[in-house]
Amino acid sequence: MNVDFIAGINNLGEKIYTCEPFKTSFQNPFIVALIITAVVLVVFFAICNPPVDKKRKTKTAIYVYICIVALLFLHYYVLNHQLNDIYNKSNMDVIVSSIHDKYKGGDEIIPPISPPSVSNELEEDQPKKIAAGSKPADSKPADSKPASSADSKPLVPLQEVIMPSQYNN
């Protein structure tokens, strides 16, 4: 087959599918509700044949019309209110607008949330404190004497000894 012919058929199918009336008719919730109601009615009449009696036929017709109106309003409400973003916006618009709403336009910088401080921490979880300029307690020889409190230096957290804080100048 000719390649141009196949490409033309594919292009024609794409044009038919993306035809503007086709797209807008299925994006309109009322049209979708009408189609769903028609399918429900066809199934209803296929399963339950209406009675032959004239009084019962009128009563059945009234019930069917009430069902049609109720289904139309139900489908219209569901499609229009709950799926509004799908019919009226593209997915990217929904994502961008949700980010915009969440961060109020992105102008504000939201500070990170710090974890809450726990008052009953275990002793090994707390940073070890050593005297500034001295060696850690594990590296002292066994025969060394403990320093008296008068001549010892103030205790500094071990993390600050290894990595001095930028803010303590």
UniProtKB/Swiss-Prot annotation:
Q: Low complexity: which segments have biased composition?
A: 144-154
Q: How does it sit in the membrane?
A: Multi-pass membrane protein
Kindly state which keywords UniProt assigns to this record, in alphabetical order. Glycoprotein, Host membrane, Membrane, Transmembrane, Transmembrane helix, Virion
**Where are the bilayer-spanning segments?**
28-48, 60-80
| Cell location | Host membrane; Virion
The region called Disordered is annotated at 107-169
The highest taxon in the source lineage is Viruses
**Glycosylation, residue list:** 88
- Which is a Gene Ontology cellular component entry for this protein? virion component
Task: Say which family it is in.
Answer: Belongs to the asfivirus B169L family.
Mind telling me what this protein is named?
A: Transmembrane protein B169L
Name the source organism: African swine fever virus (isolate Tick/South Africa/Pretoriuskop Pr4/1996) (ASFV)
